[in-house]
Amino acid sequence: MGSINNNFNTNNNSNTDLDRDWKTALNIPKKDTRPQTDDVLNTKGNTFEDFYLKRELLMGIFEAGFEKPSPIQEEAIPVAITGRDILARAKNGTGKTAAFVIPTLEKVKPKLNKIQALIMVPTRELALQTSQVVRTLGKHCGISCMVTTGGTNLRDDILRLNETVHILVGTPGRVLDLASRKVADLSDCSLFIMDEADKMLSRDFKTIIEQILSFLPPTHQSLLFSATFPLTVKEFMVKHLHKPYEINLMEELTLKGITQYYAFVEERQKLHCLNTLFSKLQINQAIIFCNSTNRVELLAKKITDLGYSCYYSHARMKQQERNKVFHEFRQGKVRTLVCSDLLTRGIDIQAVNVVINFDFPKTAETYLHRIGRSGRFGHLGLAINLINWNDRFNLYKIEQELGTEIAAIPATIDKSLYVAENDETVPVPFPIEQQSYHQQAIPQQQLPSQQQFAIPPQQHHPQFMVPPSHQQQQAYPPPQMPSQQGYPPQQEHFMAMPPGQSQPQY
């Protein structure tokens, strides 16, 4: 009898040791020591363990570098786990994606081989990023996630759906197509999530979303997340959500860590001004926004002519090309990305510390989403707006609507406003998997070549003149992105298009 008790006590002690030591065996990344603002620090003091999440999920959370929940995660995760509908409003870059991914992974049953959660996003890039967050946080959970977007092979999606898929991440058009063909069975999908809900319920997508909902069970749970809530979102809430729990963390609309400036310049002097900014600012990575796809390509060509590394991305590019640009910019292989508003929604690249509006946006909503690409997760960032005479009324209107102040740019910008003291702590984004779960590898000869990305020679354009004295100005200061963290030194030969080498496919 004594030996039995001894054995029981020994086993009990060993189990206790295992419970105590499971964290020590995790592969936790280096701590991000950059200063943060109250956007993510103003919490109630809860930890992820306080939510009683399954251990496999906690392992993925900690191995992704998460330490404590942000305010939106603290509010949304426990309520979502109870099964209640949620309407959540929080700033860009405060952890909204994890706020719905974590309860989704907690609620999905790995042994039930059905689609149990549908995550809808407005853009292909955001779908790729969200699916990767699902896979990263849920890597120990035995849960299968599939991403499906327009512009990819429909046959591959159909083949993938013949296998087990627990979580489906996609854009509305492709999801509706698969559901209408009865390829994607949503009859057991008990969780419906919309990220960037304001965009999802705009005229572009509202009808499609309504059709998709008809394929879900009537008792499904709905989670809606966004930074802005126009009237269309409220109408959708009244029609489709059952006694939703409303979260509003928007005391102010802009992130506290972003310092905003404007520079008043003539249109023909914008490139000269941009060149000056490049030489004076300590840029880790920068995103430059234009208002049209033609100006995106033209500006990328002009920046390249000045001797700076530069990629571009816009909606008229092939999906495979956009994927390559997005992947390489996330991995720090180039400092500067010129793009249209394609990348204003939800894209999370924490190494971006400067956003430049080469063309000033027309609406406060667009402005808010653009500048939110810097200062991610409570860190510091810089937003610089190049303003001409015709933009002055929009500048005033946006300041009034957002309740923010955009100051005139000073002669010297304090580096403490946007530069981390130790760039080695800047986290490298989750690596996008070399091949998505539902697409076959593309042979080497089918990859887009450098010529496919090339910009046709441009004639003299009076809007983008650069004084001869500035043509040979020095490029960025010495690279601050540490190579051991996945940010290689700046290359000697610069291009305005991604290299035509074999690259990972999505």
UniProtKB/Swiss-Prot annotation:
Q: What is the effect of changing residue 370 to A?
A: Leads to mRNA turnover defect and no growth at 37 degrees Celsius. Impairs RNA binding in vitro
Name the reaction it catalyses: ATP + H2O = ADP + phosphate + H(+)
Give yes or no: UniProt keyword NAD: no
The Helicase C-terminal domain is annotated at: 257-417
Instruction: Give positions of region: Disordered.
Output: 1-20, 459-506
Question: Which is one Pfam family of this protein?
Answer: Helicase_C
SUPFAM superfamilies found in the cross-reference section: P-loop containing nucleoside triphosphate hydrolases (SSF52540)
Effect annotated for changing residue 345 to A: Leads to mRNA turnover defect and no growth at 37 degrees Celsius. Impairs RNA binding in vitro
How changing residue 195 to A affects the protein? Answer: Leads to mRNA turnover defect and no growth at 37 degrees Celsius
Where in this protein would one find the motif DEAD box, according to its record? 195-198
Q: Which Gene3D superfamilies match?
A: P-loop containing nucleotide triphosphate hydrolases (3.40.50.300)
Q: Which UniProt keywords apply?
A: ATP-binding, Cytoplasm, Helicase, Hydrolase, mRNA processing, mRNA transport, Nucleotide-binding, RNA-binding, Translation regulation, Transport
Q: Name one GO cellular component term.
A: cytoplasmic side of membrane
- Residues in coiled coil: none
PROSITE patterns in alphabetical order: DEAD_ATP_HELICASE, HELICASE_ATP_BIND_1, HELICASE_CTER, Q_MOTIF
Q: Which residues bind ATP?
A: 90-97
**Residue intervals of the Helicase ATP-binding domain:** 77-247
Grouped into one coarse class, the protein's main location is: cytoplasm
Q: What is the effect of changing residue 369 to A?
A: Leads to mRNA turnover defect and no growth at 37 degrees Celsius
UniProt miscellaneous comment: Present with 42900 molecules/cell in log phase SD medium.
Complex formation: Associated with the CCR4-NOT complex and possibly other big complexes. Interacts with CDC39/NOT1. Interacts with DCP1, LSM1, and POP2. Interacts with IGO1. Interacts with PAT1 and with KEM1, the major 5'-3' exonuclease.
Q: What is stated about domains?
A: The Q motif is unique to and characteristic of the DEAD box family of RNA helicases and controls ATP binding and hydrolysis.
Q: What does this protein do?
A: ATP-dependent RNA helicase involved in mRNA turnover, and more specifically in mRNA decapping by activating the decapping enzyme DCP1. Is involved in G1/S DNA-damage checkpoint recovery, probably through the regulation of the translational status of a subset of mRNAs. May also have a role in translation and mRNA nuclear export. Required for sporulation. Blocks autophagy in nutrient-rich conditions by, at least partly, binding and repressing the expression of a set of ATG genes, including ATG3, ATG7, ATG8, ATG19, ATG20, ATG22 and SNX4/ATG24.
Question: What protein name applies here?
Answer: ATP-dependent RNA helicase DHH1
Q: What is the lineage of its organism?
A: Eukaryota, Fungi, Dikarya, Ascomycota, Saccharomycotina
Encoding gene per record: DHH1
